[in-house]
Amino acid sequence: MKQRLIVKTALSAAILATLAGCATQPTQEWAADTTYKLTVLHTNDHHGRFWQNKYGEYGMAARKTLIDELRAEIQAEGGSVLLLSGGDINTGVPESDLQDAEPDFKGMSKIGYDAMALGNHEFDNPLDVLMKQKEWANFPMLSANIYDKKTGERMFQAYEMFDKQGIKIAVIGLTTEDTAKLGNPEFIGAIDFRDPKEEAKKLIAELKETEKPDLIFAVTHMGHYEDGKRGINAPGDVALARYLNEGDLDMIVGGHSQEPVCMEAPNVVKKNFKPADECKPDQQNGTYIVQAHEWGKYVGRADYEFRNGELRMVSYDLIPVNLKKKVEVDGKSQRVFIESEIKEDTALLEFLRPYQEKGQEQLNVKIADTNGKLEGDRNVVRFQQTNLGRLIAVSHMERAKADFAVMNSGGVRDSIEAGEVTYKDVLTVQPFANILTYTDMTGKEVLDYLNVVATKPVDSGAYAQFAGISMTVANGKVSNVFIGGKQLRLDETYRFTVPSYNAAGGDGYPKLTGHPGYVNTGFVDAEVLKEFLEKNSPIDVNKFAPNGEIVYK
């Protein structure tokens, strides 16, 4: 905030010169030539992980212990703390999803979060669920760029002011404009997700006039893209920092891309970051940019010194929350803590336990067996055809008696390991409660549809998994299309399935809901998958292995 300091100092000097000998109230509450310590702790993309995983990693009870210890340490040294979240509290773990993330928001309140950004997955549910979640949270949910289409007014709080030892800090919230296509179209039709860069610039100008903050931070859910190279994604944190005037924004606490933002060099992200590795945040146009991967695996810690209006980052760390690694002991593989074990906070653990037990009662029932892994990892399924993507598509195709099936990879949220399969596994893979839809189209319409959907790029949730169809994709077009082993005929009619999210235009797919051949079956995707697994158990994963049906050139 160097520019503000210069203006403020010049103004103060002018007043002093004019009113020589008269006592003047300083414009700032902090003392000159005094060094203040400020620490920002942060997480993002929680996605329902209020409970530790089956290996004893992360979880909110251990996170609270860590944050309480950090707070005590920092305050003992005369420092102040802000605890921020980059959003996406919703969607990902069945025990949370079935309870509208109540344990997660109430857990965050007990941990003591100061503010969060609204993420795109906050809009997976009807708005009345989000309003209920606002009541469960004792901290503000921020977004300056979400507007009501009818009234033209902001729907959520745009910023929150904090006073830390006389330092006035404005925290603004911003949400990716991609929410318009990533959120559930059934629930966001009346919402306008405006350009967060423009809204940030406008809001910062207003804040300078009204609140006159010493520092401006942003909690964002926009994504961090190396050197701003975002592909088909909406502009992220790098683009935001570059768009603003240098010095206007001191720090971005981000989310959405679900990665550790650790840099090897300017504009070069450190590849293969591992727990306990050193992490240097990105810095763009005078703005620090941080992100703490996902799921509460880490708590980010940014230590600053503030002196005479200037902010300087002293150190940064991503602290693992009970993450483990595999080691060989006596010829057997076992998992050990990477750093010292963090004990779970007893009070929070007991508060969360009934939620966990209630969820597990419904989920831990075996429904099938599989003889191998069904691959749904986002780093695989968003880049290539996988056996799990194929299996889900086949389950939809069979239920709808369709000729082929289209399944967006963003709707495949996890893998299924070999062995017993439970309902929880199914809901972890498909947590969004999308409805199975199908559409009857002519071959010509199908070809036009595939030219949009099959050409979606890798590394995005729009990348499509297929069943019952083969084709070649090259130069933004499809060719050599075969359905059910027979070449596509433009004058024939075909039936294909697609999740309701995509049928409504999600992921930038062509909207089908107004097509005369469109049918909403009413079948929930997870239930369709569950019944398919039960019916075909034991599952032979080799039957669903891709075999070159979709060729990319």
Curated annotation (Swiss-Prot):
PROSITE patterns on file: 5_NUCLEOTIDASE_1 (PS00785), 5_NUCLEOTIDASE_2 (PS00786), PROKAR_LIPOPROTEIN (PS51257)
Lipidated sites in chain (N-palmitoyl cysteine): 22
Protein name stated in the entry: 5'-nucleotidase
Enzyme Commission number: 3.1.3.5
Protein's organism: Vibrio vulnificus (strain CMCP6)
NCBIfam families (alphabetical): PRK09558.1
Catalytic activity: a ribonucleoside 5'-phosphate + H2O = a ribonucleoside + phosphate
Cofactor note as given: Chloride.
Residues reported to bind a divalent metal cation 2: 88, 120, 221, 256
Pfam families with a match to the protein in the record: 5_nucleotid_C, Metallophos
Cystine crosslinks: none
Chain residues carrying a lipid of type S-diacylglycerol cysteine: 22
Record's signal peptide: 1-21
UniProt: substrate binding residues: 432, 501-507
One annotated Gene Ontology cellular component of this protein: cell outer membrane
Species lineage: Bacteria, Pseudomonadati, Pseudomonadota, Gammaproteobacteria, Vibrionales
Recorded superkingdom: Bacteria
Enzyme class: hydrolase
Keyword annotations from UniProtKB, A to Z: Cell outer membrane, Hydrolase, Lipoprotein, Magnesium, Membrane, Metal-binding, Nucleotide-binding, Palmitate, Signal
Subcellular localization(s) per the UniProt record: Cell outer membrane
GO biological process: nucleotide catabolic process
Membrane topology: Lipid-anchor
Job of this protein: Degradation of extracellular 5'-nucleotides for nutritional needs.
Main location: membrane
Gene for this chain: nutA
Family from the record: Belongs to the 5'-nucleotidase family.
